[in-house]
């Protein structure tokens, strides 16, 4: 239990840490990776190169300090972090390593301003946070391992099918190499794929949404090829596209994630996705359309038909199920793309154009896609009067959503 003095010191020094946050976290990662290079196998090194992980962690540290009087206000955030950590296989013995180098980085960057009292207060605050997360992660690990088909840590899977879904998205059907069943999951959850990346000389781990409904035998992930932009190409995603084939093996974590629908609810859901963000939505959609059926609105944005994954199956579902309304936006339609057949509206997803169709009593709204897309849709829903508690979103990698 933190003393009031400790809380006061942490709150008082939060603005200073925010001012120097990026430098502190950059120093922290340098120190930690030099002392423990094996942790490079856990952290996303692409995000390290781009500085995204540093920004996200600096912001998280500041948010924790700002809310230290009422940590329950951060419970949703901590739940997301715990699920991510569980999917990475984070171990309790790694927390003291992080704490040691974080405190050393604060001392190094702030110099004499980081007094013994300040370092002691932050050590206690970090220890308290670590205890909360370790408890949550232990519960997640045990819950997964106890379920039929469940496991803890990594399990070897075999690629049984590799299916192109568009010019940039490919689906992989994975079955356990041991021939056993797989644990069911909540529609919207993800698995982690661990694979050796020769270009880095490291194992790297990435999260991918499970893009089909649970069947107890296999999982499907749908992976976008990365590249062509200002950021480095996706190490793992492109490796899966170019070098992983049917019969090859990869390691998977059990499903985790707090972004999922309530399968027992009967209230409407509105799914809003951009690009490869449709992958968790497809799982949600399939389950929601089962008995008891519930009203579903699926809104998707893509550049055009060439990169619109699963479009024919979604159109067919919209024709088959009376409780499903589908709206597709293309912002760069091809000459052969026909409005009314391939897509419904030109331009970026604009929920204002379909306001009457998505403003449903007691509906929950789920958003997934690139971060700028999610910010835009979140703000648009808020402007339509949707309560924050009804809006749910998924971010893979560092959570830079709330800038």
Swiss-Prot record:
Site location (Involved in heme-bound ligand stabilization and O-O bond activation): 29
Tell me the SUPFAM superfamilies matching this sequence. Ferredoxin reductase-like, C-terminal NADP-linked domain, Globin-like, Riboflavin synthase domain-like
Cofactor(s) for this protein? Answer: FAD; heme b
User: What does the cofactor section's free text say about binding?
Assistant: Binds 1 FAD per subunit. Binds 1 heme b group per subunit.
Listed A to Z, the keywords are: Cytoplasm, Detoxification, FAD, Flavoprotein, Heme, Iron, Metal-binding, NAD, NADP, Oxidoreductase, Oxygen transport, Plasmid, Transport
Q: Which GO terms describe its cellular component?
A: cytoplasm
Cite the GO molecular-function annotations of the record: FAD binding; heme binding; metal ion binding; nitric oxide dioxygenase NAD(P)H activity; oxygen binding; oxygen carrier activity
Task: Indicate the annotated site residue(s) for Influences the redox potential of the prosthetic heme and FAD groups.
Answer: 84, 394
Q: What class of enzyme is it?
A: oxidoreductase
What's this chain's function?
Is involved in NO detoxification in an aerobic process, termed nitric oxide dioxygenase (NOD) reaction that utilizes O(2) and NAD(P)H to convert NO to nitrate, which protects the bacterium from various noxious nitrogen compounds. Therefore, plays a central role in the inducible response to nitrosative stress.
The family note in this entry says: Belongs to the globin family. Two-domain flavohemoproteins subfamily. In the C-terminal section; belongs to the flavoprotein pyridine nucleotide cytochrome reductase family.
Additional remark text:
No protein-heme interactions have been detected at the distal side of the heme molecule. FHP is able to bind phospholipids with high affinity.
Q: What is this protein's name? A: Flavohemoprotein
Q: Which organism is it from?
A: Cupriavidus necator (strain ATCC 17699 / DSM 428 / KCTC 22496 / NCIMB 10442 / H16 / Stanier 337) (Ralstonia eutropha)
């Amino acid at each position: 239990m933190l003393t009031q003095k400790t809380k006061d010191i942490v709150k008082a020094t939060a603005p200073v840490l925010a001012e120097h946050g990026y430098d502190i976290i950059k120093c922290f990662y340098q120190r930690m990776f030099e002392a423990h290079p094996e942790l490079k196998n856990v952290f996303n090194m692409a995000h390290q190169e781009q500085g995204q992980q540093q920004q996200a962690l600096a912001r998280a540290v500041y948010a924790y300090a700002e809310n230290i009087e009422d940590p329950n206000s951060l419970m949703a955030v901590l739940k997301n972090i715990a699920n991510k950590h569980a999917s990475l296989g984070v171990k309790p013995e790694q927390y003291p390593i992080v704490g040691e180098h974080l405190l050393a980085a604060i001392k190094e960057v702030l110099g004499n301003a980081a007094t013994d009292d300040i370092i002691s207060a932050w050590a206690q605050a970090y220890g308290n946070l670590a205890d909360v997360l370790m408890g949550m992660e232990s519960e997640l690990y045990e819950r997964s391992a106890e379920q039929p088909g469940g496991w803890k840590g990594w399990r070897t899977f075999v690629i049984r099918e590799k299916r192109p879904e568009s010019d940039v998205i490919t689906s992989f059907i994975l079955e356990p190499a041991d021939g056993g069943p797989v644990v069911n999951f909540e529609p919207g959850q993800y698995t982690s794929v661990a694979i050796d990346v020769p270009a880095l000389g490291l194992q790297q781990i990435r999260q991918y949404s499970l893009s089909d409904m649970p069947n107890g035998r296999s999982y499907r992930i749908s992976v976008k090829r990365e590249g062509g932009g200002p950021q480095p190409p996706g190490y793992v995603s492109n490796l899966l596209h170019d070098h992983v084939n049917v019969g090859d093996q990869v390691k998977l974590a059990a499903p985790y994630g707090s972004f999922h629908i309530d399968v027992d609810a009967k209230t409407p859901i509105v799914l809003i996705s951009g690009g490869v963000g449709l992958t968790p939505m497809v799982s949600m959609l399939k389950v929601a359309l089962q008995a008891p059926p519930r009203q579903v609105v699926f809104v998707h944005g893509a550049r055009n038909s060439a990169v619109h994954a699963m479009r024919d199956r979604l159109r067919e579902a919209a024709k088959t199920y009376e409780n499903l309304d589908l709206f597709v936006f293309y912002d760069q339609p091809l000459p052969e793309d026909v409005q009314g057949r391939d897509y419904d509206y030109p331009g970026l997803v604009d929920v204002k154009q379909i306001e009457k169709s998505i403003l449903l009593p007691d509906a929950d709204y789920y958003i997934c896609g690139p971060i700028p897309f999610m910010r835009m849709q979140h703000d648009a829903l808020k402007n339509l009067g949707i309560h924050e508690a009804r809006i749910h979103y998924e971010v893979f990698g560092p959570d830079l959503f709330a800038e």
